[in-house]
Regions:
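A short, charge-rich alpha-helical start-of-domain segment used by transcription regulators
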Residues: 7-31
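Amphipathic alpha-helical segment used for protein-protein interaction
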Residues: 12-15, 106-139, 144-146, 153, ...
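Residue-level preference for hydrophobic side chains embedded in well-ordered alpha helices
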Residues: 21, 25, 29, 50, ...
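Amphipathic, Lys/Arg- and hydrophobic-enriched alpha-helical face
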Residues: 22-40, 127, 179
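Structural recognition of an alpha-helix C-terminal capping motif at a helix-to-coil junction
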Residues: 31, 45-52, 56, 64-76
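DNA-recognition helix of helix-turn-helix
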Residues: 65, 134, 143, 148-182
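Arg/Lys-rich amphipathic alpha helix in sigma70-family domain 2
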Residues: 72-94
Length: 184
């Protein structure tokens, strides 16, 4: 079933919308949640919460593409769960968040709605300008929380080369955001 048809089911308040979402994007959402939480049961719970949150937000929202929409909801729910579970512990997600936090705007004035939209556009433009391999590695690290070791294995690179590529890409992103007026 196409995304538009599934969104229409949500808008009609048809419970089959959840079943269709699960059929089409269940494994995708589980992958996102599992990468962050590293626990199958917790990931399943987050995926179910994702369906509920999607049900609660459509309507009023009407996403053009359902995959990034449910992916974003799932990722945010998983990050929230991770934060609750690991207030004292350090893990892969904490490392990822620390790495990316260095280059994202941090004060409240930079995080109003308009700035958030502008930042989203800047990030998308930045990512589009990267070579395909670099873009894929960057997204896998900072969206899916893949470890440097996983990325090195998948892309047939040394871990040190992946770490350096990520560092250089973060530095380029930081420079790009500063040129556009964001305080980082």
């Amino acid at each position: 079933m196409k995304d538009k048809q599934i969104v229409d089911l949500y808008l009609e308040r048809s419970e089959s919308a959840i079943a269709e979402t699960e059929k089409k994007y269940g494994r995708y959402c589980h992958y996102i949640a599992y990468q962050i939480l590293e626990n199958d049961e917790d990931a399943k719970e987050i995926v179910n919460d994702t369906y509920l949150k999607t049900w609660q937000t459509i309507p009023p929202k009407r996403p053009e593409s359902l995959k990034p929409y449910v992916g974003m909801i799932c990722r945010q729910l998983a990050l929230n769960a991770y934060e609750e579970q690991h207030t004292q512990k350090r893990g892969q997600v904490a490392l990822v968040l620390d790495e990316i936090a260095e280059i994202l705007p941090g004060n409240d004035e930079d995080w109003d709605v308009v700035s958030g939209i502008v930042l989203n556009d800047l990030l998308n433009n930045f990512l589009r300008g990267l070579p395909q391999k670099t873009r894929n590695i960057f997204i896998r690290r900072y969206w899916y929380a893949s470890s440097v070791a996983e990325l090195a294995k998948e892309y047939s690179m040394k871990e040190s080369a992946v770490a350096m590529l990520l560092l250089r890409t973060r530095n380029k992103l930081k420079t790009h955001l500063q040129k556009e007026g964001f305080n980082v």
